[in-house]
Amino acid sequence: EFVYEQKTEPHRVDLAIFLNGIPVAMIELKKRTAGQSAGVEGMRQYRTTRNPKEKVFGFDRRTLFYLVMDEFEAFVATRLDGKETKFLPVNRGTAEGGAGNPIEAGKHPTHHVWDELLERDMLLRIIRDYLFIDDEGKMIFPRYHQLDAVLKLERDVRERGVGGRYLVWHSA
């Protein structure tokens, strides 16, 4: 738990990831089996109880992204803006081409967030190579399918060398 103060009243975020003492990610965890979902309660919590004027939540000053997840789905926002906060899914999609994540024996459907995206080297790479502020002032965080496609292409080029032809077909 990460405790911060909002006008002398302590508040908590379930998890915070720091890099050299600087908060780079905040994570709210929900449990759908307890009646909470990332897509409803988690997003509402960020939109209504996290003041974007707090230093720790200030855009482009401290925290780079905000995850909310339950056992089945994960979502990310790069800027807290009260009720206007926009979340995008960070899910792999199902084998049938649907939204969400596939079910794998012995793993939560959102294990890819822990095992891949928040893995130390990958998190540093996302911060270094993929997070950026576009011309409109929006922080861009790679969607899972985009990052996955780029990593597969890189791996193939390393194995086969340059000069290959690729068609990347993806949808969110």
Located regions from the model:
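ATP-dependent helicase/translocase motor core
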Residues: 1-172
